[in-house]
Curated annotation (Swiss-Prot):
Pfam families: MbhD (PF13244), MbhE (PF20501), Proton_antipo_M (PF00361), Proton_antipo_N (PF00662)
UniProt name for this protein: Na(+)/H(+) antiporter subunit A1
Keyword Chloroplast: no
TM regions (residue ranges): 1-21, 30-50, 79-99, 117-137, 166-186, 208-228, 265-285, 300-320, 337-357, 377-397, 427-447, 472-492, 522-542, 591-611, 621-641, 646-666, 671-691, 707-727, 764-784
Oligomeric form and interacting partners: May form a heterooligomeric complex that consists of seven subunits: mnhA1, mnhB1, mnhC1, mnhD1, mnhE1, mnhF1 and mnhG1.
Location in or out of the cell: Cell membrane
Protein's job: Mnh complex is a Na(+)/H(+) antiporter involved in Na(+) excretion.
Similarity-based family: Belongs to the CPA3 antiporters (TC 2.A.63) subunit A family.
Lineage: superkingdom: Bacteria
Organism: Staphylococcus haemolyticus (strain JCSC1435)
Annotated coiled-coil segments of the chain: none
Listed NCBIfam families: 2a6301s01, PRK12645.1
Signal peptide: none
């Protein structure tokens, strides 16, 4: 096992150990025991930067189930190390922050167990090379995030948010699994880097488009893109450390990682480029618009997170256009990848800090309601400084890092509207328009976030707690992030060569990537767009009280949340009614549905798939065989029309004995003897049972009832006959009987082939069948014994009552 494997497994192991430590060290905050884990992992991944910076990749294999191609393979390149550093780096700061945020009276054992479980799952997602292993870790992130969001399970809103996130992300996970299976079938491999290497062949597969759609669904649900974004605002009911971790740097970025990782596979598709870019931009616009009307600080950050995720998603779509050009023109669109990678880091820094400050404000004032907050500038000066730096970075104001990636984003959007491919040079004009409008509202909610907390009139009577500055433990992590916002804004070169360029190379497949970010590079269309954003943003701020009423006037019934809640309300009743319509307690009705579907599926298959009948190897039919068949048919018909149960059982026995005679004709004496014995026993049991059964009324059967029975019976008979003839006439493989003939003696040392097959070749099958019969027999015996005890107890009670 390599160090890379240990890095993934380590948080999962400690997730099991930490709750045990909590029992013995309750006087010490459990976070101090957890903190070294992400710190050590962060240092380890930092040591690997030199490897990925030089263009090398690391592949580590650990055999698990190699016979089905399912191994614990890890793949480290510039993209995966970027996400690994975010997961462990932000994770370290979140754990440090949680020590000040969560008191010792909380269920810290559970909290840190869930947090480490999530951290290990995220590392597994970004480092796994095997598609099935990646999917398992993907679902583990959904499960662990459900536990984290519902941590305060006494609150109904927490349970509701956790359930919603689980339902939507698991739906995406199932779609993702389907996409992975299809793409692995198309590429004949479960290895992600092998599939990317064979992208040119996979793109011609008929499964390509279906795999692409399913994988996009998985990515969109995880990264909260329109229309699946509705789970993220409700997930804000989680403790603030969870929100700062999951919704700034980790879980919501998993979908972005997936899109970036599989871009080399799907970038050739016009549908991929248009869908990824357009969905991202619509998400940016819609979420930024909704963020402006939120009355809860976390609500603002939730929708701002959705909008920023849409922004990064659209950048990845723009970058995919580079696969259709070469040379300098390709470099123009690779700027989309570099902007996406750089903004991934920038968003983690400023959004993580903003979540932590929001938690600090909530912690010291007791509320996040913007109507009750305000005037905290002099009371919380350190928090104010951090908020100004990070919120202005989110708004795209220099000299902070958010401005640099926003400029590159606008530059890429303007360039794409001139691309002479997939009609982007005509229809692509919608891209920069959506980008600019979304950025205007981003500017508005970023400035309003500062004003809501620190400006206006202080209302001490409206606050549940007396406001004061947060503790140093709660401020240390956001201070570090705010410093990084400034440093990366002034010195972007610290990231470009070590992080941005290797990650961009991993996505684009080009080795000569040159990522450059400058605070000012002349009067360009992107800079002019920025000026427009600032001017219109200021105008909207000045007229905020007028136009915000229009947003609040939106009918609730037109929202996606209303549709989600309505579906959750009515779906169980609808499903129950549908189920009750065919699962009504009548065996006959269930059989009609089952056999009816069998007939329909068989007919559709026969009409769509060519087949033929081949009778060349069929032996001659003798007169005595025809006689037995006629007897069998007559007996079966008499079973159906019999008026007496006794006569029906006798005719059923005739059917069974006729089959045993046919086995004798076909030279299968063992089968004939078995059939004869079974038929004799079953007939005797039937007669014994019927002797004890009460007389039942015979219901009048309608004509439609009889007609349905007749059609189903005839249909099933024809299906079995046709399938049997087709199977006989279309033998594409050597009969397995030849294998048994060749090895029945030398492997099993037996001469009776049937017995050897049952006892040796299919011995386990026979054993389990016998076990099932034994269990059924025990069940019947238990029921009879309990009935006898019940009857005897009733007799005793009656005797005592008489006495």
């Amino acid at each position: 096992m390599s160090l890379l494997h240990i890095a993934v497994i380590l948080p999962l192991i400690f997730a099991l150990i930490i709750p045990i430590l909590y029992r013995f060290f309750k006087k010490i905050h459990l976070g101090w025991f957890v903190l070294p884990i992400p710190v050590v992992l962060f240092i380890y991944f930092l040591s690997l930067i030199s490897t990925t910076q030089s263009g090398n990749t690391v592949i580590k294999t650990l055999n698990w189930m190699p016979h089905i191609g399912m191994n614990f393979d890890l793949y480290l390149d510039g993209l995966s190390i970027l996400f690994s550093l975010l997961i462990t780096g932000i994770g370290s700061l979140v754990v440090l922050y949680s020590i000040g945020y969560l008191s010792k009276s909380e269920q810290l054992g559970n909290f840190y167990c869930y947090l480490l479980l999530f951290m290990g799952a995220m590392l597994g997602v970004v480092l796994s090379d095997n598609l099935i292993i990646l999917y398992l870790f993907w679902e583990l992130t959904s499960f662990s995030s459900f536990l984290l969001i519902s941590f305060w399970r006494e609150k109904k809103a927490s349970i509701y948010g956790a359930q919603k996130s689980l339902i939507i992300t698991v739906f995406g996970g199932l779609s993702l699994l389907g996409g992975f299976i299809l793409i692995s079938l198309a590429g004949d491999s479960l290895s992600l880097h092998e599939l990317i290497a064979n992208a040119s062949e996979i793109q011609h597969s008929p499964l390509f488009i279906f795999a692409m759609v399913l994988i996009m669904l998985g990515a969109f649900t995880k990264s909260a893109q329109v229309p699946f974004y509705i789970w993220l605002p409700d997930a804000m009911e989680a403790p603030t450390p969870v929100s700062a971790y999951l919704h700034s740097a980790t879980m919501v970025k998993a979908g972005l990682y997936l899109v970036a990782r599989v871009t080399p596979l799907f970038a050739i598709s016009q549908g991929w480029i248009w869908t990824i870019t357009l969905v991202g931009l619509i998400t940016l616009f819609w979420a930024s618009l909704n963020a402006t009307k939120q009355q809860d600080l976390k609500g603002i950050l939730a929708f701002s997170t959705v909008s920023q995720l849409g922004m990064i998603m659209s950048m990845l779509g723009i970058g995919a256009v580079s696969y259709h050009f070469e040379g300098s023109q390709s470099q123009l669109y690779i700027a989309g990848f570099t902007a996406a990678v750089f903004h991934l880091v920038n968003h983690a820094t400023f959004k993580g800090a903003l979540f932590m400050i929001t938690g600090a404000v909530d912690h010291v004032t007791g509320t996040r309601d913007v109507k009750k907050l305000g005037g905290l500038l002099t009371i919380m000066p350190i928090s104010f400084t951090i908020t100004v730096i990070t919120a202005l970075s989110m708004a795209g104001i220099p000299p902070f890092n958010g401005f640099l990636s926003k400029e590159k984003f606008l530059e890429a959007m303007i360039e794409i509207s001139h691309a002479n491919v997939f009609s982007l040079d005509t229809l692509g004009i919608v891209f920069p328009i959506l980008a600019i409008v979304g950025s205007i509202f981003t500017f508005v909610y970023s400035i309003k976030f500062i004003m809501y907390i620190f400006f206006g009139k202080h209302q001490p009577n409206a606050l549940p707690k007396k406001a004061h500055e947060a503790s140093i433990l709660m401020l240390l992590s956001p201070i570090i992030l705010a410093v990084l916002v400034v440093v990366f804004g002034l010195f972007p070169g610290l990231l470009t060569q070590s992080i941005v360029e290797p990650a961009t190379t991993a996505i684009s497949g080009m080795s000569n990537v040159n990522a450059e970010f400058h605070l000012f590079h002349g009067i360009t269309p992107a800079f002019i767009s920025t000026l427009i954003i600032w001017i219109l943003g200021i105008l909207l701020l000045l007229t905020f009280s007028y136009w915000i009423r229009l947003l609040h006037a939106q009918p609730t019934r037109l929202t996606l949340n209303h549709w989600y809640d309505s579906t959750g309300k009515y779906l169980p009743n609808y499903s129950a009614n549908m189920t009750n319509s065919y699962v009504n307690g009548y065996v006959r009705d269930s059989l009609v549905i089952i056999f009816g579907m069998l007939i329909v599926v068989t007919i559709v298959t026969l009409l769509s798939v060519p087949f033929d009948f081949n009778f060349k190897d069929i032996n001659n039919i003798h007169i005595y065989e025809i006689a037995i068949l006629i007897l069998l048919i007559i007996a079966a018909f008499m079973v159906v029309i019999a008026k007496s149960r006794l006569f029906s059982v006798i005719m059923l026995g005739v059917v069974g004995y006729s089959v045993s005679v046919l086995f004798v004709f076909f030279k299968a004496p063992d089968l004939a003897l078995t059939q004869f014995v079974v038929e004799s026993i079953s007939t005797a049991l039937f007669l014994l049972c019927f002797y004890h059964l009460p007389n039942l009324n015979r219901y009048n059967e309608t004509r439609s009832f009889k007609l349905t029975n007749a059609l189903i019976s005839i249909g099933v008979g024809l299906v079995v006959i046709i399938l049997g003839l087709i199977a006989y006439g279309n033998r594409h493989f050597t009969s397995i009987g030849e294998y048994y003939k060749a090895h029945v003696y030398d492997l099993a040392h037996g001469k009776n082939m049937v017995n050897v097959i049952l006892v040796d070749f299919r011995g386990m099958d026979t054993l389990f069948e016998s076990s099932v019969l034994g269990i059924a027999g025990l069940g019947v015996y238990t029921m009879i014994k309990l009935r006898r005890k019940h009857q005897s107890s009733e007799v005793k009670s009656d005797e005592q009552a008489e006495q």
